[in-house]
Amino acid sequence: MRVIASSIRKGNVIEQDGKLYVVLTAENIHPGKGTPVSQIEMRRISDGVKISERYKTTDQVEKATIEDSNFTFLYEDADGFHFMNPESFDQVQVPKEVVGNAAPYLAENMSVKLSMHDTTPVAIQLPQRATLEVVDTEPVTKGQTASSSYKPAMLSNGVRTAVPPHIGVGTRIVVMTEDGSYVERAKD
């Protein structure tokens, strides 16, 4: 499907020169003089190479047809990540480049959305929040409950984040999967 370059957004998949690219950033620039342009940074799905393209906002770009489906995460091995469609029980192998920064948040039997172009996985969407355990942080100091400063902590998945002073080792917390930021103490 052909669309104008100014309508391309982050997360879209573009087909260019027979290859698929996922859009990382898309910015429309309107200079004081001259023609408005769309600056698009994208990553080639096949090998992970990042490129930056500049189009006139009225240029036509081929947007790939993408289908989102629910999948369950099974396991990770040297070949990549393995997911199963819960309805058809078909298994799909997803390369590490496609999973990217989402890898630490994947847990066995976690439900995720996979974006597919034909039978090729091009993107993964995790649940917005994940519950993890704090495995290392500075000890709780009495009298720091009123302060709004955060302290560094290591989570059970190996990700570093900042937590409030009252959070100690062994506490289960909820974090945003997009950036690993602290949301709240888990209610379980």
Curated annotation (Swiss-Prot):
Annotated GO CC locations: cytoplasm
Chain coiled-coil ranges: none
Chief location category: cytoplasm
Annotated pathway: Protein biosynthesis; polypeptide chain elongation
Family matches, as Pfam families: EFP, EFP_N, Elong-fact-P_C
Matching Gene3D superfamilies: 2.30.30.30, Nucleic acid-binding proteins
Superkingdom in the source lineage: Bacteria
NCBIfam families in the record: efp, PRK00529.1
Protein name: Elongation factor P
UniProt source species: Rhodopseudomonas palustris (strain BisA53)
